[in-house]
Design a protein with these regions (language model features):
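ATP/NTP phosphate-donor binding region
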Residues: 1-63, 74-75, 108
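Catalytic core of DAGKc-family lipid kinases
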Residues: 5, 31, 78-127
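Generic detector of intrinsically disordered, low-complexity, polar/charged segments
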Residues: 10, 61-64, 72, 83, ...
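Phosphate- and divalent-cation-binding pockets in alpha/beta enzyme and binding domains
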Residues: 48, 71-72, 95-96
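Short, basic, helix/turn surface patches
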Residues: 61-68, 115-120
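Short Gly/Thr/Asp-enriched flexible loops that form oxyanion-binding sites at enzyme active sites
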Residues: 68-80
């Protein structure tokens, strides 16, 4: 079974993930992922949990705004081998997601992740 770490910021944007969280988790579960879910509590929380648990999963998915995504990537940069990264935009502007064409509707973004849609990836060197 594939393992996923799902990190989300419940305060991002207008807290819109709260109404869609169960649908998102259902999409991942039905796709065969063993989920570990982490709700961010404070600044740098996403970075710390990804740095600590990222090596134990096949994919890290974060949901929040550009700040949550930045923290998630910062945590991944501390890993020797990076898992795949998925992003479900839930912030107020979502500039990064818009620039890559990631769907703004959260369930659609979740489906893209499980279907293996790929966008330009981070280089392994971090540069």
């Amino acid at each position: 079974m594939k393992k996923m770490l799902f990190v989300f910021n419940p305060r991002s944007g207008k807290e819109q993930i709260k109404g869609q969280l169960m649908e998102i988790l259902d999409i991942f579960t039905k796709a065969g992922y063993e989920l570990r879910v982490h709700v961010t509590q404070k600044q740098r929380d996403a970075m710390e949990v990804v740095a600590r648990l990222g090596k134990k999963v096949d994919v890290v998915v974060c949901s929040g705004g550009d700040g949550t995504l930045n923290e998630t990537i910062s945590g991944m940069m501390k890993l020797k081998k990076m898992p795949l990264l998925g992003y479900i935009p839930a912030g107020s502007t979502n500039d990064f997601a818009t620039s890559l064409g990631i769907p703004k509707r959260m369930p659609l973004a979740a489906w893209d992740i499980v279907e293996g849609c790929q966008f330009p990836s981070l280089p392994q060197s971090g540069r």
